Amino acid sequence: MEKVTRRAFIGGMGAILATGAVAMSGCAPKDDGKQAELSATGSDQSEAPVPDETLEFDIAVVGAGCSGLAACVQAAESGASVICIEAKSIAGGAAGGVEGLFAVNSQIQKDQNITVSMGEMIRTELEQNQYRNSGLVLRDLVKASGEDIDWLVSKGVRFGKVDNYVGFHPIFHWFETGTGAESYIVPMNETAVGEGVGFLFDTHADELICDEGGSVVGLFATKADGTVVQVNTRAVILATGGYAERLDLLAEFGYTEENCIPTTMGCDGSGHDMAIAVGGASNTSNMGMLGGTTVPDLPAFFEGGYFCSVMNSLANIPWVLWVNERGERFVNEDLSLANHMITANPIRMCKQAFILMDEAMMNDYVAGDAQGLKELEDGQAKGIIFKASNWKDLASSIGADAEILSETLESYNGCCEAGDDSDFGKASEFMRPLAMEGTVYAVEIKSSLGKTMGSLKTDRNFNVVDEQAEPIAGLYAVGVEGAMIWANVYTMNISGSCGAHNIYSGRTAVLHAVETRL
């Protein structure tokens, strides 16, 4: 059985400890005369929600995931009073499925005599993104990454080995337990609580409050019981995780219910919407996507420190054949060898997509594995894996044109026999012809979208900027919400850079807010 890591996989992981809301009494911003600024709002008072409760804090962090927790701890360490508003009942967000973080020049690396060329790494990442990402932010992140790891260690975060994971350099710092559930979330949550950070769980941030000058000075949020809370603050830090759940917003990029499955729950786009509503500039046309390919309704399971599945791993097998809803081949099937995140992209150009295999291929792949056999049976029962006695019947089962599928098979097998994929250039060692007679299979695959990366335009301080590239005072977007270092796809050349960016952006935004807003 092949093991597959899921960097953005979210589940109800038992190792993540829920923490109750910290009492709000006694928490207030520094009394330096600036509090009067928080009473004004730029919104129409007749339309503004009527709060049942009003709170006062220096900094409000929306979202208690990887970047949100980093922001909370940094803010408390900097002497600010902090409230964290989290829609779920526990802290952690997507951090529970993150296996480790990128860094250069951490003390852990120094102790192991690991050295890496920063310039070469930065150039490779810029080239892979076709220079559509922010070189300045990327450079800042790389140069600060080692100190960020050291800072996390000082907060109780536990790391294990350092290797290259799937990238080019030995820069991936594995969490001690293999995921962030116990090694990151638990110690950072405990540190935040110990430093006096207030948490409002089961509370959804809905709307930002601006003063007459356009600065963000607070927000409205709604608790699970419908109670409306107004939080007056000097800075709002959005750590809301993007909008991977919002297929209505993703439709313009080709993602539909037929070809895509959002895999990270809670990414409802509320942070994006709130920022746009107060003049923030959208970066959706240039944002990156973190995801991959999955077999729907056959979820991965956690085993031995990895998220595992048999059928879900098929998209990473290069010797199969991919076809669209018409039965046409549309890509070189070894694309995952460069980056398994890339596999999501060609699928969004299709209405539907399927992996085709003959009986010998399926038997070789499953290899008698009990879990694999169960998934094969379950998939057929759910109508996502199709089995037929011939290709014509299989075409009918998946709704493809039998004549087109026949032409596809003839062309593909011809390329296999020639040892040259003249259609899409798949490496010859992966060109395995499909039997034209006997039992055959089709496995439906969809894009598995874990995160949108960088839907809001931000500057080097992670201030959200307006359409004139001017920062909106008091408003920040961190983590994947405000990421400017990926375009189109999460490249993974710098393994763990998403998690590292979460830490760096959360800390950087807070330090700028403390310097300029408090």
Spell out what each predicted region is:
Residues 46-48, 81, 87-198, 202-204, ...:
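Conserved N-terminal/central alpha/beta ligand/cofactor-binding core
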Residues 209-230:
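Conserved beta-strand-loop-beta-strand element in the redox core of flavoprotein oxidoreductases
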Residues 272-400:
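An anion/pyrophosphate-binding glycine-rich loop and adjacent beta-alpha core
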Residues 55-57, 226-235:
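Core beta-strand elements of the Rossmann-like FAD/NAD(P) dinucleotide-binding domain
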Residues 235-298, 493-495, 499-508:
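Glycine-rich loop(s) and the adjacent beta-strand/alpha-helix scaffold that form part
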Residues 1-17:
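N-terminal secretory signal peptides and thylakoid transit peptides that target proteins
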Residues 404-489:
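A glycine-rich dinucleotide-binding beta-alpha-beta segment and adjacent secondary-structure elements
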